[in-house]
């Protein structure tokens, strides 16, 4: 009797899973939530890769470490997940990082400092502050970052490019750099943003600034 009862429970569960999978599959398709070839990420960490196959009961995902995750369609309908299709079809992939400056190195620029920046930094050769405004070296550095990014073919100028100073903390003053890389392929995207920030970090001393470094 126990064996029969257990068998009935198992059959009901299989039937329930099949119905849920069928309904979820219809929802995924009707709402165009996911397709084979999409890059998806689950916040749970169960999957981060390319969708290979969608069936009644499973969504098969090849992760970037070449493992395979098998996810019930119902999971994608009932739980949040990130589909990167919009990024891959758009004109760029977002880069958003910060460079944290040492607050003690921020200062108003003297005419001599501005002359030196114009002479030593080609992109700043024609820089003129607004009339009546004495800029800080941090402000001039932000102008340089924007000009530098605008000079790079790998940066999509048609999408948002924003350089902003965030609230100062005990760890310094963050300068947030926000732009879109034209190249969306993971390896090249990482190389591009690394090269850009290598350059921006190396340029910090040119503006009489220092990057904040914590020390006991």
List where the protein language model places each region:
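Single conserved hydrophobic/aromatic residue that forms the stacking wall/gate
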Residues: 1-6, 10
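Hydrophobic (often cysteine-bearing) scaffold residues that line and stabilize catalytic clefts
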Residues: 2, 15, 193
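Membrane-spanning helices that line or support transport/gating and their immediate boundary helices
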Residues: 14, 18-29
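Conserved, well-folded catalytic cores of nucleic-acid-processing
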Residues: 22, 26, 57, 84, ...
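Soluble accessory domains appended to multi-pass membrane transport proteins
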Residues: 27-142
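Long, non-transmembrane cytosolic or organellar matrix-exposed soluble domains/tails
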Residues: 119-216
């Amino acid at each position: 009797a126990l064996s029969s009862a257990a068998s009935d429970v198992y059959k009901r569960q299989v039937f329930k899973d099949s119905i849920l999978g069928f309904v979820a599959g219809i929802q995924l398709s009707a709402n165009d939530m996911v397709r084979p070839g999409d890059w998806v990420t689950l916040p749970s960490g169960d999957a981060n890769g390319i969708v290979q196959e969608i069936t009644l009961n499973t969504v098969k995902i090849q992760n970037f470490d070449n493992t395979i995750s098998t996810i019930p369609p119902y999971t994608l309908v009932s739980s949040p997940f990130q589909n990167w299709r919009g990024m891959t079809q758009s004109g760029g992939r977002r880069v958003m990082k910060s460079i944290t400056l040492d607050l003690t190195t921020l200062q108003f620029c003297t005419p001599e400092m501005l002359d030196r920046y114009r002479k030593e930094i080609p992109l700043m050769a024609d820089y003129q502050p607004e009339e009546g405004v004495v800029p800080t070296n941090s402000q001039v550095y932000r102008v340089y970052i924007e000009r530098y990014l605008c000079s790079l073919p790998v940066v999509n100028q048609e999408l948002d490019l924003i350089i902003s100073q965030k609230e100062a903390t005990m760890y310094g003053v963050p300068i947030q750099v926000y732009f879109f890389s034209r190249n969306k392929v993971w390896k090249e995207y990482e190389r591009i943003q690394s090269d850009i920030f290598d350059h921006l970090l190396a340029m910090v001393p040119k503006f009489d600034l220092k990057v904040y470094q914590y020390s006991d």
